[in-house]
């Protein structure tokens, strides 16, 4: 039975105790750890979360609504809503604001403090009539559910739409870089460039909007490329980092993708926490359907938030069950 930590984990303890940021070199070394060392790395990540994370032991829970679905012109390889793919998916235009209010109220009454309006498509470079309808939805939620943090994920934004979202009091805006930016065109999509997303992030931040930006694991990336994504997120100084685990969907190019092992995913979550001690790290897609019995482990590997109540085109878990999970996880902080 071993009595000492792996030297690279010991080095990480020493570095983080000084308050110095995790270096790319040390993160890469941690990414090469054998599976037998993962629980020690998870323990370190949980300690860092307990000491530094913005939520101070609380779980950041959010829920989303697919307010406009399908027929997206972008060719994201994992997505059922792309018209380039043949997945079966519900198709509908922007829903009525009463439906948005109904779903937001349900989440709010179950104790969920953040609610996101999500639409399919490239985004909004200008303020269009449809975008104005979304602004109206945001205003309605603020009026009728005071205290709810209203969020959105509407794709790439131009200057004017970003400024309007700030004026209407959006709390967080989600737009993911998904992978190491250098591999975006190959692994995710080539109908748009990752720099269009990065430009949106910078517009949002310049308008004072908190940015929710992360990635997806299991699309063909290497561990080193996951670390590249993690450090790109640090350079962008985002507020919330959602980490998704690919749920392969029939009719998409990734329908037969090989799953990433649980130790690899746990290492990724832990390294993300070590690189982002104070940020909210949110476990999103794949938590229930792919990780199943191991989702608690990944929450202890540095995550302090999750998406609950379902995703855009795949099922999730009911909110009451997730609230019980949150109560149990809080005992480890």
Swiss-Prot record:
Amino acids binding [2Fe-2S] cluster = 151, 212, 282
For this protein, what reaction is catalysed? Answer: (4R,5S)-dethiobiotin + (sulfur carrier)-SH + 2 reduced [2Fe-2S]-[ferredoxin] + 2 S-adenosyl-L-methionine = (sulfur carrier)-H + biotin + 2 5'-deoxyadenosine + 2 L-methionine + 2 oxidized [2Fe-2S]-[ferredoxin]
Which residues does the annotation say bind [4Fe-4S] cluster?
72, 76, 79
> Which residues does the UniProt record annotate as the domain Radical SAM core?
54-287
Pathway, according to UniProt? Cofactor biosynthesis; biotin biosynthesis; biotin from 7,8-diaminononanoate: step 2/2
SMART domains (UniProt xref): BATS (SM00876), Elp3 (SM00729)
Q: Which cofactor does it need?
A: [4Fe-4S] cluster; [2Fe-2S] cluster
Q: Which Pfam families match?
A: BATS, Radical_SAM
Extract the PROSITE patterns matched here.
RADICAL_SAM
BP-aspect Gene Ontology terms: biotin biosynthetic process
Stated EC number for the protein is 2.8.1.6
The enzyme's first-digit EC class, named in words, is: transferase
Name the keywords, alphabetized.
Answer: 2Fe-2S, 4Fe-4S, Biotin biosynthesis, Iron, Iron-sulfur, Metal-binding, S-adenosyl-L-methionine, Transferase
Has the keyword Mitochondrion been applied to this entry? no
Gene3D superfamilies xrefs: Aldolase class I
Q: Which InterPro entries match?
A: Aldolase_TIM, BATS_dom, Biotin_synth/BioAB, Biotin_synthase, Elp3/MiaA/NifB-like_rSAM, rSAM
Cofactor binding notes: Binds 1 [4Fe-4S] cluster. The cluster is coordinated with 3 cysteines and an exchangeable S-adenosyl-L-methionine.
Q: How does it assemble?
A: Homodimer.
Q: Which NCBIfam families match?
A: bioB
Task: Tell me, in a sentence or two, what this protein's role is.
Answer: Catalyzes the conversion of dethiobiotin (DTB) to biotin by the insertion of a sulfur atom into dethiobiotin via a radical-based mechanism.
**Family as reported in the entry's similarity comment:** Belongs to the radical SAM superfamily. Biotin synthase family.
For this entry, the protein name equals: Biotin synthase
């Amino acid at each position: 039975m071993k009595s000492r930590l792996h030297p690279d984990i010991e080095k990480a303890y020493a570095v983080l105790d000084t308050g110095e940021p995790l270096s790319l070199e040390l993160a890469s070394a941690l990414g090469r750890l054998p599976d037998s060392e993962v629980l020690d790395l998870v323990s370190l990540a949980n300690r860092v979360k307990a000491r530094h994370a913005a939520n101070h032991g609380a779980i950041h829970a959010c829920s989303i609504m697919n307010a406009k679905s399908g027929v997206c012109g972008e060719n994201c390889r994992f997505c059922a809503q792309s018209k380039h793919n043949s997945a079966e998916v519900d198709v509908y235009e922007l829903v009525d604001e009463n439906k948005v209010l109904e779903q937001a109220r349900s989440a709010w009454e179950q104790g969920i403090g953040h609610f996101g309006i999500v639409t399919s498509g490239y985004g909004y470079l200008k303020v269009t009539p449809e975008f104005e309808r979304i602004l109206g939805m945001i205003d309605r939620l603020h009026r009728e559910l005071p205290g709810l943090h209203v969020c959105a994920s509407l794709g790439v934004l131009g200057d004017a739409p970003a400024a309007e979202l700030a004026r209407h009091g959006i709390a967080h805006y989600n737009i993911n870089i998904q992978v190491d930016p250098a591999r975006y065109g190959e692994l995710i999509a080539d109908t748009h460039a990752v720099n269009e997303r990065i430009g949106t992030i910078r517009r949002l931040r310049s308008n004072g909007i908190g940015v929710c930006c992360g990635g997806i694991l299991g699309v063909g990336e290497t561990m080193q490329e996951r670390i590249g994504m993690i450090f790109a997120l640090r350079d962008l100084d985002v507020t919330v980092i959602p980490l998704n685990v690919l749920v392969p969907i029939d009719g998409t190019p990734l329908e037969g993708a090989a799953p990433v092992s649980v130790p690899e995913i746990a290492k990724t979550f832990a390294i993300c926490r070590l690189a982002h001690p104070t940020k909210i790290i949110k476990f999103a897609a794949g938590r229930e359907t792919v990780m199943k019995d191991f989702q608690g482990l990944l929450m202890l590997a540095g995550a302090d938030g999750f998406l609950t109540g379902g995703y855009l085109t795949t099922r999730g878990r009911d909110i009451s069950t997730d609230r019980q999970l949150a109560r149990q996880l809080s005992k480890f902080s």
